[in-house]
């Protein structure tokens, strides 16, 4: 795994390329993220770094969390994220990781929490076809058959049904970094990313790179 960065989704806009084509982009506030812990094989059994993101008050954190951050000299942060690495020698406590970690044209994977839609029905949640809309129809948005009868006498686990939609972790892979504003720690990512404006995002270099 390679080092990534935490950020906040600010919203969407569009930019134009050299040919005048409009490109929809998501504006992401990426970092800065201080290194709050360095794990080694001798002390932890594996090598990794931990970074923090998002300022908060001391009152919002527990004493163990405050003590943990004090070791790195970091100010109180709201979020922590760990990245496993083969070599951590180039990192040190308190080091800041910012948007210049990425470059224009680079492919990235972005993880976040999708927008919660509440309790949703079959059509909205699973794209089921609706029933006939004629006057005599008694099945407009009902699911249809959910299984057999006496045998097995139950609905199998995993059956697609109405229920909570969204508000789950989603990862969108191989998105392109269109622009990098290192001064303001802002990334412009081609396309959409999970969540609504203000959502926390985890941005990492793409792990699967290829045409297919």
From Swiss-Prot:
A cellular component term, taken from the record's GO annotations: cytosolic large ribosomal subunit
- What is the protein's known function? One of the primary rRNA binding proteins, it binds directly near the 3'-end of the 23S rRNA, where it nucleates assembly of the 50S subunit.
Q: Which residues are the signal sequence here? A: none
Question: What Gene3D superfamilies would the database entry show?
Answer: 3.30.160.810, Translation factors
Task: Name its GO BP terms in alphabetical order.
Answer: translation
Pfam families assigned: Ribosomal_L3
Q: State whether it acts alone or in a complex, and with which partners, per the record.
A: Part of the 50S ribosomal subunit. Forms a cluster with proteins L14 and L19.
What InterPro entries does its record include? Ribosomal_uL3, Ribosomal_uL3_bac/org-type, Ribosomal_uL3_CS, Transl_B-barrel_sf
Region (Disordered), start-end ranges:
129-156
User: What gene name is listed for this protein?
Assistant: rplC
Family, per entry: Belongs to the universal ribosomal protein uL3 family.
Low complexity bias spans:
142-153
Q: Which domain of life is it from?
A: Bacteria
Task: Kindly give the SUPFAM superfamilies that the UniProt entry links to this protein.
Answer: Translation proteins
Keywords of the record, alphabetical order, are: Ribonucleoprotein, Ribosomal protein, RNA-binding, rRNA-binding
Q: What is this protein called?
A: Large ribosomal subunit protein uL3
Instruction: Mention one GO molecular function.
Output: structural constituent of ribosome
């Amino acid at each position: 795994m390679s080092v990534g960065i935490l950020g906040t989704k600010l919203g969407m806009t569009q930019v134009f390329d050299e040919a005048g084509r409009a490109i929809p982009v998501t504006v992401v506030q990426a970092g800065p993220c201080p290194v709050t812990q360095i794990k080694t094989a001798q002390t932890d059994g594996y090598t990794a770094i931990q970074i923090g993101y998002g300022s908060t008050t001391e009152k919002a954190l527990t004493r163990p969390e405050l003590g943990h951050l004090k070791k790195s000299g970091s100010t109180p942060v709201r979020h922590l994220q760990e990245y496993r690495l083969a070599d951590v020698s180039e990192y040190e406590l308190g080091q800041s990781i910012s948007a210049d970690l990425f470059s224009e044209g680079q492919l990235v994977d972005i993880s976040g929490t999708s927008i919660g839609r509440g309790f949703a029905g079959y059509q909205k949640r699973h794209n089921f076809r609706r029933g006939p809309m004629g006057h005599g129809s008694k099945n407009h948005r009902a699911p249809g058959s959910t299984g057999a009868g006496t045998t097995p006498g139950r609905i199998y686990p995993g059956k697609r049904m109405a229920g909570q939609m969204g508000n789950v972790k989603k990862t969108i892979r191989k998105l392109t970094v269109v622009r990098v504003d290192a001064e303001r720690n802002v990334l412009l990512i081609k396309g959409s990313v999970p969540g609504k404006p203000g959502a926390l995002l985890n941005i990492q270099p793409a792990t699967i790179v290829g045409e297919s």
